[in-house]
């Protein structure tokens, strides 16, 4: 034995003289374990089911709200054929503000920009910009009205349009689309001029 009174080699108990474990007690312990485990799993599944039901309800509410918003937007008269005019002065002031370190070269740049601006105005008449395109103009109008931008971007993606063009209304319409729109607009104008 060591200083704590424990045997050094084995337990020192003759196992042939130890009584057997009572079976009723073992069965009671197993039953208690099974009952507690089943109760825990039932509570867990109930909580999960409630949370899933709450999420499902919230998703349905969001879907309903989105449908109502879509219906309200489609009921606004004139939203389909709205064009937004962007003045070229805003564009030049933005470009001048972007280069504050080049103040000594500004007079030369202004004269260059004025001539470049006149050339771009001539070419702008031939190029269809995003602001003048009726497909994009209605989305730009939605932004001005105050519709959430993410909802507009999702709607544009669902219709196959580029949502990044919302931030660049003076950009030209992507290739292939401008020719179609020019033909469609000329067809629609000629149909009204009998």
Swiss-Prot record:
Gene Ontology BP term (one): endosomal transport
Coiled-coil positions: 46-74
Bias (Polar residues): 103-121
Subcellular location: Early endosome
Region of interest called Disordered, as start-end residue ranges on this chain: 93-121, 159-194
Database matches in Pfam families: CCDC53
GO cellular component, as recorded: early endosome membrane; WASH complex
Principal location class: other
Modified residues (N-acetylmethionine): 1
Source organism superkingdom: Eukaryota
Keywords, alphabetical: Acetylation, Coiled coil, Endosome, Protein transport, Transport
Family of this protein: Belongs to the CCDC53 family.
Quaternary structure annotation from Swiss-Prot or TrEMBL: Component of the WASH core complex also described as WASH regulatory complex (SHRC) composed of WASH (WASHC1, WASH2P or WASH3P), WASHC2 (WASHC2A or WASHC2C), WASHC3, WASHC4 and WASHC5. The WASH core complex associates via WASHC2 with the F-actin-capping protein dimer (formed by CAPZA1, CAPZA2 or CAPZA3 and CAPZB) in a transient or substoichiometric manner which was initially described as WASH complex.
Biological role stated in the UniProt entry: Acts as a component of the WASH core complex that functions as a nucleation-promoting factor (NPF) at the surface of endosomes, where it recruits and activates the Arp2/3 complex to induce actin polymerization, playing a key role in the fission of tubules that serve as transport intermediates during endosome sorting.
Annotated protein name in UniProt: WASH complex subunit 3
Encoding gene (name): WASHC3
């Amino acid at each position: 034995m060591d200083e704590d009174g424990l045997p050094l080699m084995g337990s020192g108990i003759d196992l042939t003289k130890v009584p057997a474990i009572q079976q009723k007690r073992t069965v009671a312990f197993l039953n208690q374990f099974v009952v507690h485990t089943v109760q825990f799993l039932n509570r867990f599944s109930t909580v999960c089911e409630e949370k899933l039901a709450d999420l499902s309800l919230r998703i349905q509410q969001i879907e309903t709200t989105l449908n109502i918003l879509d219906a309200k937007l489609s009921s606004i008269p004139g939203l389909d054929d709205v064009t937004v005019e962007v003045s070229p002065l805003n564009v030049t002031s933005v470009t001048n503000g972007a280069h504050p370190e080049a103040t000594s070269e500004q007079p030369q740049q202004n004269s260059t920009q004025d001539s470049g601006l006149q050339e771009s105005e001539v070419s702008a008449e031939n190029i269809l910009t995003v602001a003048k395109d009726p497909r994009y103009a209605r989305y730009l109008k939605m932004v001005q009205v105050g519709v959430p931008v993410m909802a507009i971007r999702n709607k544009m993606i669902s219709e196959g349009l580029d949502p990044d063009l919302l931030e660049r209304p003076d950009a030209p319409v992507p290739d292939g689309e401008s020719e179609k729109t020019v033909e469609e607009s000329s067809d629609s104008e000629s149909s009204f001029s009998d």
